[in-house]
Amino acid sequence: MRNLPIIALDFKSADEVHTFLNKFNEPLCVKIGMELFYQTGPALIKSIKKRGHDIFLDLKLHDIPNTVSKAMEGLARLDVDLVNVHAAGGIKMMEEAKKGLRKHNADIKIIAVTQLTSTTETQLHEEQNIQTSIEEAVLNYARLTKKAGLDGVVCSPLEAEMISKELGTDFLKVTPGIRPKGAARNDQQRITTPEEAKTLGSTHIVVGRPITQSEHPIDSYHKIKESWLS
């Protein structure tokens, strides 16, 4: 996966995606989530790959180990660049996910979601019944992910630094919750700017609405890209 800001393609149709991508004349890294994938299926992935873009397929698989393994066998054939599972599924599920992926593709990176960046500490305690801080809950899931042999985690940039210190800088930290200065928070709770994310140890950042809903998406993307790579 190129070290570029990953644009979250939060659109409802393939036509909207291609209209957006047609504005750009350069290789991009993009994220396809559940909403878009369930609407468009593998056909959109193939068309985006033909354009030369890298793809993070963000489906957050979470099921029994055998089911996730078989699902990963199918996703491996799509030739995306990055896939993910939920760390809450446990070590065995994550190990089987990687095995399923490797049956057909040795190059796709696989990471695990720790806690969503929309999760608050109150929700963690009262709804998930995890009686630790968010930071400790995230770090615990990151430890399990590395033990399972995966390539990294999805986490808030606010947690990237502590994960790097314990699990190493080569362990991927893919961080949503990125907002340029002055941008709306939307439904994100644990956020930083691109510059802060880099300082904290994020290896990749995911940015959606500040680019896709911008009146000038190319300019917005290039400003974020410049601040991330500088």
UniProtKB/Swiss-Prot annotation:
Keywords: Decarboxylase, Lyase, Pyrimidine biosynthesis. GO terms for molecular function: orotidine-5'-phosphate decarboxylase activity. Its EC number is 4.1.1.23. The active site is at 60 (proton donor). CDD domains: OMP_decarboxylase_like. It holds the Pfam family OMPdecase. Coiled coil: none annotated. Substrate binds at residues 10, 31, 58-67, 117, 179, 188, 208-209. NCBIfam families: PRK00230.1, pyrF. Homodimer. Catalyzes the decarboxylation of orotidine 5'-monophosphate (OMP) to uridine 5'-monophosphate (UMP). This is Orotidine 5'-phosphate decarboxylase.
